[in-house]
Swiss-Prot record:
Protein name: Pantothenate synthetase
Source organism (scientific name): Thermus thermophilus (strain ATCC 27634 / DSM 579 / HB8)
Cysteines joined through disulfide linkages: none
Purpose of the protein: Catalyzes the condensation of pantoate with beta-alanine in an ATP-dependent reaction via a pantoyl-adenylate intermediate.
Entry-linked InterPro entries: Cyt_trans-like, Pantoate_ligase, Pantoate_ligase_C, Rossmann-like_a/b/a_fold
Primary enzyme class: ligase
Record-annotated active site: H32
Keywords attached to this entry: ATP-binding, Cytoplasm, Ligase, Nucleotide-binding, Pantothenate biosynthesis
Entry EC number(s): 6.3.2.1
Annotated positions binding beta-alanine: Q56
Quaternary state and interactors: Homodimer.
Amino acid sequence: MRTVSTVAELRAALPREGVGFVPTMGYLHRGHLALVERARRENPFVVVSVFVNPLQFGPGEDYHRYPRDLERDRALLQEAGVDLLFAPGVEEMYPEGFATRVQVEGPLTALWEGAVRPGHFQGVATVVARLFLLVQPQRAYFGEKDYQQLLVVRRMVRDLGFPVEVVGVPTVREEDGLALSSRNVYLSPETRKKAPVLYRALLAMREVAGQGGSVAEALRAGEEALRAVPEFRKDYLAIVHPETLLPLSDWVAGARGIVAGRFPEARLIDNLEVYP
């Protein structure tokens, strides 16, 4: 595996076609490696980027303390069979005078994470667009754990005509259901035991749906599950359309349960298909 940190080195190292791309912010875990494994199976050449993107963090968020360990990441990617690691600095990605932003409009970015974290998806769309232009992948891999982000990237790709297939990969979970996240490292041992409450709320909603209950009944079951852990401060719990993310009052195929909120040490999000 080769590691490069500049745009010039990246361009010199890329093949002309057959690139599968996994953009990350580093501090890799099994969820990231599932993306890499899928990319490795489906593409002759695999590129991974590690870049903690300042544009997607708001004031008071965890940009400066976001976990970083490039040497550990490099070892994991080498073992996973990655061909090229692109690990640029901020100045390389956003040179002095960089003034362009990419904005996906509408409910996809206005609701849920977009409402709680203003400007977040503009930062995501900007960095992903720049990375796509630099790496020129045929396929790019994103985890379903960040489901709203996946839909935003797909919309940007459709609207701007990027010749990239955006592949969603199912969420990887711990044995107790907690979705893997680099931010889980923030959790104290006591909070870690309580963190699967997000997944339990989603399962409760799916169970009600499976028994023929209404959307309203499913939401009540999810809320009840969350109340069992008073330390968790909910930002939102909803059942939404799987493509528009608009809240539902009646079931549709693929309806998605989404949940987010804060523990004292960290903010967590999760989602699950609750109606097949």
